[in-house]
């Protein structure tokens, strides 16, 4: 009964809890995804998969800061064929959301069509802030967001989630464009544009010079984005950005998030964060007199 308190259903898919492993945190082997689930994740998102293999950027690709990370990985991935071959015979008892990226609507659609056999849903990486030609340039323009989402929905019946960038003046325009294109949900936010400089070397630390900032430092930005999106959209919002504790998780749920993705906290503290956060949410629900997590979603929108 206690476990059922955290159960959510999104896009017709059952998640035993709303805490989802975010894309790009761990290697995408089936074994590691199972480990994430066994240690408390309600579902997983794979690393972003592209049409061709990508090595990614040279080290250093991550800078640790007091309140998070700046990363510029460069979308390293084995390409769709190798990924499909690795996963095609695997069977999972939890939802696997496949993240895909491309430079055009046609590339996104191609990948969705090819990877449909191994995906319970797709997350469209429309918002990578450090990979030239992929993501950010597409994801900042509502027209492009609409076209990418529509192209993918035209070739697959699987649920489609548009991952939105915070690096715009009004994120709700992106969310509404995704909804018009047929998206089943949106996830927000991706990383915030950032840079770190070595004051002695007198140069940027990352090999790519610039990257994306994640972790506790962006939580208020992410929370505002979720709040704004949940007010205007009729599709679910998945909250991402700086969730490190059950209190953070509850804030996002109250702001209108139907589920949550956790990334940087897993990188810094390991998979144990899933059970820590789940246990904290359960205690909060009991103390506040709620029987289900569904009872608190969006309560802050009603005041």
UniProtKB/Swiss-Prot annotation:
<protein>
    <recommendedName>
        <fullName>Dihydroorotate dehydrogenase B (NAD(+)), catalytic subunit</fullName>
        <ecNumber>1.3.1.14</ecNumber>
    </recommendedName>
</protein>
<feature type="binding site">
    <location>
        <position position="47"/>
    </location>
    <ligand>
        <name>substrate</name>
    </ligand>
</feature>
<comment type="pathway">
    <text>Pyrimidine metabolism; UMP biosynthesis via de novo pathway; orotate from (S)-dihydroorotate (NAD(+) route): step 1/1.</text>
</comment>
<dbReference type="InterPro" id="IPR013785">
    <property type="entry name" value="Aldolase_TIM"/>
</dbReference>
<feature type="active site" description="Nucleophile">
    <location>
        <position position="128"/>
    </location>
</feature>
<keyword id="KW-0288">FMN</keyword>
<dbReference type="GO" id="GO:0044205">
    <property type="term" value="P:'de novo' UMP biosynthetic process"/>
</dbReference>
<dbReference type="GO" id="GO:0005737">
    <property type="term" value="C:cytoplasm"/>
</dbReference>
<feature type="binding site">
    <location>
        <position position="125"/>
    </location>
    <ligand>
        <name>FMN</name>
    </ligand>
</feature>
<keyword id="KW-0560">Oxidoreductase</keyword>
<dbReference type="InterPro" id="IPR012135">
    <property type="entry name" value="Dihydroorotate_DH_1_2"/>
</dbReference>
<comment type="similarity">
    <text>Belongs to the dihydroorotate dehydrogenase family. Type 1 subfamily.</text>
</comment>
<keyword id="KW-0665">Pyrimidine biosynthesis</keyword>
<feature type="binding site">
    <location>
        <position position="125"/>
    </location>
    <ligand>
        <name>substrate</name>
    </ligand>
</feature>
<comment type="subunit">
    <text>Heterotetramer of 2 PyrK and 2 PyrD type B subunits.</text>
</comment>
<feature type="binding site">
    <location>
        <position position="189"/>
    </location>
    <ligand>
        <name>FMN</name>
    </ligand>
</feature>
<dbReference type="Pfam" id="PF01180">
    <property type="entry name" value="DHO_dh"/>
</dbReference>
<dbReference type="InterPro" id="IPR049622">
    <property type="entry name" value="Dihydroorotate_DH_I"/>
</dbReference>
<feature type="binding site">
    <location>
        <begin position="190"/>
        <end position="191"/>
    </location>
    <ligand>
        <name>substrate</name>
    </ligand>
</feature>
<comment type="function">
    <text>Catalyzes the conversion of dihydroorotate to orotate with NAD(+) as electron acceptor.</text>
</comment>
<keyword id="KW-0285">Flavoprotein</keyword>
<dbReference type="InterPro" id="IPR033888">
    <property type="entry name" value="DHOD_1B"/>
</dbReference>
<feature type="binding site">
    <location>
        <begin position="71"/>
        <end position="75"/>
    </location>
    <ligand>
        <name>substrate</name>
    </ligand>
</feature>
<keyword id="KW-0963">Cytoplasm</keyword>
<feature type="binding site">
    <location>
        <begin position="263"/>
        <end position="264"/>
    </location>
    <ligand>
        <name>FMN</name>
    </ligand>
</feature>
<keyword id="KW-0520">NAD</keyword>
<feature type="binding site">
    <location>
        <begin position="47"/>
        <end position="48"/>
    </location>
    <ligand>
        <name>FMN</name>
    </ligand>
</feature>
<dbReference type="InterPro" id="IPR024920">
    <property type="entry name" value="Dihydroorotate_DH_1"/>
</dbReference>
<dbReference type="InterPro" id="IPR005720">
    <property type="entry name" value="Dihydroorotate_DH_cat"/>
</dbReference>
<feature type="binding site">
    <location>
        <begin position="241"/>
        <end position="242"/>
    </location>
    <ligand>
        <name>FMN</name>
    </ligand>
</feature>
<feature type="binding site">
    <location>
        <position position="163"/>
    </location>
    <ligand>
        <name>FMN</name>
    </ligand>
</feature>
<dbReference type="InterPro" id="IPR001295">
    <property type="entry name" value="Dihydroorotate_DH_CS"/>
</dbReference>
<feature type="binding site">
    <location>
        <position position="215"/>
    </location>
    <ligand>
        <name>FMN</name>
    </ligand>
</feature>
<dbReference type="GO" id="GO:0006207">
    <property type="term" value="P:'de novo' pyrimidine nucleobase biosynthetic process"/>
</dbReference>
<dbReference type="GO" id="GO:0004589">
    <property type="term" value="F:dihydroorotate dehydrogenase (NAD+) activity"/>
</dbReference>
<feature type="binding site">
    <location>
        <position position="23"/>
    </location>
    <ligand>
        <name>FMN</name>
    </ligand>
</feature>
